């Protein structure tokens, strides 16, 4: 089993009793599917349905908050975008990029861990507080990961994805869009 260090990614914690309902109105996938054992991907889009980011959403082990990760270059813009519509909702979004390491174990499918299909195969995400990582992982190099990503057909921000991309153009509707969940920013365009 190879491990991938995704710690450079932007990381956010979403808290408050309205966190699931609020985030569900901001992203293309059904946030109610998220659990401490399952991670989902979702698109953050403009009102015109164009991508503002592809994110991964999981739940912390205490089930008290949602954890989001995204491409590092989207750290500031996504923080602003995801916070933009908080008005009277009991929701707070915190940038925890510097507080956690994010490790993805390829080919791992332990039901007791946070399952994630980031690279089109079974895997597990581990959010680890900085300084708590235990040595011993068999790390995949950045070059090998990029080759693997391309072979698996996984789009990446700055390569196949940008702010002019509609989710369907990158086949993101296959696992990052739920057409039955209800309204979210950009939904009318994406559902056409």
Feature-to-residue mapping (PLM):
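Basic, glycine/lysine-rich polyanion-binding surfaces/domains
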Residues: 1-192
